[in-house]
């Protein structure tokens, strides 16, 4: 297969994935907003301490207030679109850095060394040392076998850590953390599809563009 034809196939695959991922992220981000009683065309009470029986942490209360203010300023749809776009861009950036061994911690975020969707970061969670995520928190999540929540916290902490290296791309998350999509370890998640749908070589700066 010629490199030109392969590139054309890659572009089509990437485009199809991007369209699907955008819609999927918008749906999941919207669902998270609803969980925190932030909905379109409905005035939200920004002083709630308990939602659906769940007591909000101090960080959650601050983030929720920030989210409500953003919705008041920009509109619900615009905020949801921006958050979905933010997470999409960060997943793509992290995957690019993972494939090219650019990650500062030298630990793969989405895959193992065989490019299987078995995130190395889960195995190295106790050793990676990410600001904002204590070993006690990690240990408790490991003990409760809550891998989905552990992975979520590791990804959020990684994005915040990357702000020390690429502050323009990885700004502090703020209220976007509330709207982080759930269940990213599922085989049909945006992250899983990123690995399965788009060839690793598409992100490899050394291999991409080589003539076959």
Regions found by a protein language model. Give the residues of each.
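Preference for the N-terminal adenyl/adenosyl cofactor-binding alpha/beta module
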Residues: 2-212
């Amino acid at each position: 297969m010629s490199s030109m034809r392969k590139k054309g196939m890659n572009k089509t695959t990437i485009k199809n994935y991007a369209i699907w991922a955008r819609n999927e992220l918008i749906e999941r981000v919207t669902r998270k907003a609803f969980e925190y009683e932030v909905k379109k065309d409905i005035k939200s009470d920004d002083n709630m301490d308990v939602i659906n029986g769940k007591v909000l942490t101090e960080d959650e209360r601050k983030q929720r207030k920030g989210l409500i203010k953003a919705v008041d300023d920009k509109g619900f749809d615009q905020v949801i679109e921006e958050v979905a776009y933010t997470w999409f861009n960060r997943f793509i950036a992290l995957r690019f850095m993972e494939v090219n061994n650019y990650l500062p911690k030298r630990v793969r975020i989405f895959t193992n060394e065989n490019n299987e969707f078995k995130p190395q970061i889960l195995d190295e969670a106790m050793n990676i040392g990410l600001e904002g995520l204590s070993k006690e928190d990690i240990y408790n999540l490991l003990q409760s076998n809550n891998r989905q929540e552990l992975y979520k916290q590791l990804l959020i902490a990684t994005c915040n850590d990357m702000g020390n290296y690429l502050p323009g791309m990885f700004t502090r998350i703020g209220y976007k953390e509330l709207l982080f999509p759930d269940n990213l370890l599922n085989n049909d998640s945006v992250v899983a599809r990123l690995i399965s749908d788009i060839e690793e070589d598409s992100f490899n700066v050394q291999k991409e563009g080589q003539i076959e």
